Amino acid sequence: IMMVNEICEKKYNKPLSGCTNEEIYYALLDMTKDLAAKKESEAGKKKVYYISAEFLIGKLLSNNLINLGLYKTVKKELEAAGKDIGEIEEIEPEPSLGNGGLGRLAACFLDSMATLNLHGDGVGLNYHMGLFKQVFDHNFQKETPNPWIEKDSWLIKTNVSYPVSFGDLTVTSRMYDIEVTGYEGRTNKLHLFDVDTLDESLIKDGTISFDKTDIAKNLTLFLYPDDSDENGRLLRIYQQYFMVSAGAQLILDECIAKGCNLHDLADYAVIQINDTHPTMVIPELIRLLVERGLDMDEAIEVVSKTCAYTNHTILAEALEKWPVYYLKKVVPQLMPIIEVLDDKVRRKYEDESVSIIDRNDTVHMAHIDIHYGFSVNGVASLHTEILKETELNNFYKIYPEKFNNKTNGITFRRWLLHCNPALTELLDELIGEGYKKDAAELEKLLAFKDDEKVLDRLVEIKHANKEALCKYLEETQGVKVSPDTIFDIQIKRLHEYKRQQLNALYLSLIH
């Protein structure tokens, strides 16, 4: 492996010690991308396509170096040249491709599939400005764009592009890839679709306001654009269809290249629909299969064996639904298919609450997923039980075999190996390194639960971490805090319906 000094000599014609932190960051970016690409390989004929409106992947440099087994080596080489890997990591902008638990779940599954050597790629959109950057000015929130794409980034521009037709215009998608490294595993891909016609100058200076009607120029500017008006709501449908249409065309191309005859699509692909944003992939795939010669009934059967749905919403009334006239305007080609899907459900089940189009002419996206997919999962056991017992009980009675639970843990390679090296060292010493690939191995720690020496070391490690946090708070916030403080830390944007609100009220009460 060519190490950092050699890369700096080659790229900048000077040694590592003479490079700026920025130069070293870009050298490491090149090196990591090259090494990750070498771990790609076709693995068997079947592949998972994980379609999601968001992927909260976090900064990638440290994560990729850990997964490639290079973090310690690179850190030592940088230290020998008088450089600090922590300062270099700070230079990397965080990809603005996700927001919350839904996006983190997607990123965790990609990480996990690559680590388990499973063939599974992500499919999403290449947002340029993310959700928004939150700043407070005189106690009021100001939203500003959150750009992250630079000339050199983790994005790899491909030659893959597909036409995507809406009711009133056709755009051409362009696919960008980000490599997803597994821990000592394979490299998969996150496919992100974009448009070459995007125009960032549509955004009004320092705000997140823009012309929501110019679809060819605004399509991938923001994640979840403001939907408080009709143009914003329509834009969300444009975004969703753009993602699934380009994604469906990619999936069919890849499967056909492996020998799929379309009748056997389910032997080549499984499509995981992460929440309801990608639901239109179901009617879109049916449309494409019919266009390519399958009859409608068979196309529906094939797609139903290929798609699965992850539910994130506990309340039935909060599930995504769109007026028929919105869909007729944006994706008129899908409405006849959605009507056929609804008709099939109505013929089979008298219960109106499970139909797809209700009497107010509203299309219920989750209902498409449940009827025309082979699996419905919740994301925590209590959540799944509530879905089965109350919120989706009508569907559970029809399809008990479809409902299952998938609880997501944490990606401990980031939150333990990288964030807490001292604790990692202690664990290695106590139980070996198997836990780095199999979290169940952490149960071996129970043998030490009464070991005073081990418990003392845990307290020491925790205290040292609190001292580091106090130093950071003093440097960045100008606040001096005692390391004996109890810290309750929440690292999301401040939000009006999250636990932070309760915390703020509680603090104002006790102080």
Model-derived segments and spans:
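A conserved ligand/cofactor-binding region detector
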Residues: 1-510
